[in-house]
A protein has these predicted regions:
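Conserved Class I S-adenosyl-L-methionine-dependent methyltransferase catalytic core
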Residues: 1-75
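Alpha-helical subdomain
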Residues: 71-239
């Protein structure tokens, strides 16, 4: 339903998006282009469909990306923009010693608590906030799953610098995205995702080198990229 009601409508303006180099929310929904989530979250029903869609993605793909690296040395995890907590659930299932804080906007957190919370697992908690503005929870590891591809390089750099400042010494960040090949000419699925980012967000999919170029200036080192063989890949960097 989310694809039919939001994504498909934006793709009707693909040619304009390519010419203008920006998303098509203004033409499609009358929403200013910089207000990325106003269209996605334009009603309670649309927000719920979006969160359910992301939850379905991580129920299929989550374990693979979280197992790309051994994350057991990171007992305290913060999932920034973690929506329903679906990826957090996969993380606590895979790593018995970890606790995960899901950090997202207040409306999202409240909906997650109503529809998706896991009261039987005390290792998952929710915290409200805007990761561009509000203090970030201290953690050993930050998960950024399908977050950086929403934003410009400048906004990604600002967010990564904030994460580095909040991260415990010796901790790290796990970026989960669909990686382009080094020359940017594939995989085809990732190229299509990048076009989708163009019509709907301020961002794009990136190559491993482009992610390194964002992470290193923010202060991260030992940056490792791993293909998972699935839809999404993993990048681990240390503070």
């Amino acid at each position: 339903l989310y694809v039919a009601r939001t994504t498909y409508l934006c793709w009707a303006h693909l040619a304009e998006a390519v010419r203008e180099g920006k998303n098509q929310y203004l033409k499609t929904f009358g929403v200013p282009s910089e207000e990325l989530f106003s269209a996605i979250y334009r009603s309670e029903g649309e927000r719920l469909q979006f969160l359910r869609g992301l939850g379905d993605v991580w129920s299929v793909e989550g374990r693979g990306v979280l197992a790309a690296f051994d994350l057991s040395p990171f007992p305290l995890v913060c999932d920034l923009g973690g929506c329903s907590g679906a990826l957090a659930k996969e993380c606590t299932s895979l790593y018995a010693g970890c606790h995960v804080t899901v950090f997202d906007m207040p409306d999202v957190v409240q909906m997650a608590k109503r529809h998706f919370s896991f009261p039987e697992d005390g290792r998952i908690s929710f915290r409200e906030g805007d990761f561009f503005k509000d203090p970030l929870p201290e953690a050993d590891l930050y998960l950024l799953a399908r977050v950086l591809h929403d934003w410009t390089d400048d906004k990604c750099s600002r967010l990564l610098a904030r994460i580095h400042g909040a991260c415990r010494t010796g901790g790290g960040i796990l970026v989960i995205e669909s990686l382009l090949d080094a020359d940017g000419r594939g995989p085809l699925t990732t190229q299509l995702y990048s076009l989708n980012m163009l019509v709907q967000t301020e961002g794009r999919e990136r190559t491993p080198a482009q992610y390194r170029a964002l992470l290193a200036p923010a202060g991260f080192h030992d940056i490792q990229c791993r293909r998972t063989g699935g839809t999404y890949d993993a990048i681990l960097a240390r503070k």
